[in-house]
């Protein structure tokens, strides 16, 4: 879609296998939580941070599209400032900060899906999350909650698996994309959130 409306919403078309194109919007994704983890110096895993964030009650969110989060001197401070400037609760620790990030991303996903549906005239009943974000159980639950859609999360190594899948189709191991997708779904522990 090369319309003015698509450009206004910062949408893109990404080329893929077999001359297919995906209409999409690049979202900050896990960059914010990676920055928070690194800056905090914690030795906890992303899964542990995600779990601990899910047990906090802060409801603050920030705009993940805001350029202030692209490369701030301190991601933790920038998130706190954004919360303060908007009159919301300021996160008090790593876990509240992570909760703000996860809730903000889920809200961002919901608004992006609404934009895509508006531009395409299509309604999507499910969301597929792949890559590292698919391991963030709390984020996936929030995404299902905020979007009202079923979320399928995984596989986490989607790029490598996708490259292998294309080679297997080309060599005749699979008849088509549908067959390889079914195999991936059955083989890699895709989790479902509703």
Label every PLM stretch briefly.
Residues 1-126, 135-159, 165-192:
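Active-site core segments that coordinate phosphate-bearing ligands/cofactors
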Residues 132:
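Glycine-rich Rossmann-fold phosphate-binding loop(s) that bind the pyrophosphate
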């Amino acid at each position: 879609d090369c319309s003015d409306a698509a450009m206004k919403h910062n949408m893109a078309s990404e080329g893929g296998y077999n001359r297919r194109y995906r209409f999409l919007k690049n979202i900050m994704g896990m960059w914010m939580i990676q920055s928070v983890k690194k800056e905090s110096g914690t030795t906890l895993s992303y899964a542990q941070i995600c779990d601990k964030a899910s047990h906090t009650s802060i409801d603050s969110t920030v705009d993940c599209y805001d350029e202030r989060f692209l490369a701030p001197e301190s991601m933790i401070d920038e998130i706190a400032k954004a919360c303060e400037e908007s009159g919301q609760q300021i996160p008090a620790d790593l876990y509240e900060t992570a909760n703000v990030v996860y809730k903000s991303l889920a809200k961002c996903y919901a608004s992006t899906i609404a934009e895509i549906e508006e531009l395409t005239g299509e309604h999507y009943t499910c969301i597929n999350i792949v890559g590292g974000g698919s391991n963030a159980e709390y984020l996936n639950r929030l995404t299902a909650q905020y979007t009202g859609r079923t979320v399928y999360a995984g596989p986490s190594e989607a790029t490598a698996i996708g490259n292998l899948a294309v080679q297997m189709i080309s060599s005749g191991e699979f008849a088509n994309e549908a067959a390889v997708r079914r195999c991936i779904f059955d083989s890699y522990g895709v989790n479902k959130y509703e």
